[in-house]
Amino acid sequence: MADTAKVALFVRLEAKPGKEADVEQFLRGGLALVQQEPATSLWFGLRLSATTFGIFDTFPNEAGRQAHLSGEVAKALMAKAPDLFAQPPSIEKAEILAAKLPGSANKAA
């Protein structure tokens, strides 16, 4: 597998009633901040249902993941959490076992 995707985060976000558009706007705006993080390989803001959103991102190593967790998007997420979310964001760490990335064939880690 490419060295750009060894570990990941999946963040589940449940919007408060009436805050769905604000959560969507927050995720769209977060892209500009993440683009300034050299160790964040891939980043996706997701809508899973009418009120459930998510973030999936990948990193080349644990140091990159920790840098992201200490970065501007994470700070903004936690600052806005009480206003936007029905419950605290659920942040799950994952190890990437296999991936198909642009410009590469399927490979196991």
Show the residue positions of the predicted features.
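Active-site-flanking beta-strand signature of metal-NTP-handling nucleotidyl enzymes
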Residues: K6-E14
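An amphipathic, aromatic/His-enriched active-site/gating alpha helix that lines ligand/cofactor pockets
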Residues: A2, G29-L42, T58-K93
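Residue-level detection of beta-strand scaffold positions
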Residues: F10, L27-R28, F56
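GIY-YIG nuclease signature motif recognition
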Residues: V11, V23, W43
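Glycine-rich beta-strand-turn "strand-cap" elements at beta-sheet edges
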Residues: M1-V7, L42-T52, L77-A109
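Short coil/turn motifs at secondary-structure junctions
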Residues: K16-G18, L48, P60-E62
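Short, surface-exposed ligand-recognition loops at beta-strand->loop->(often short) alpha-helix junctions
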Residues: E14-E24
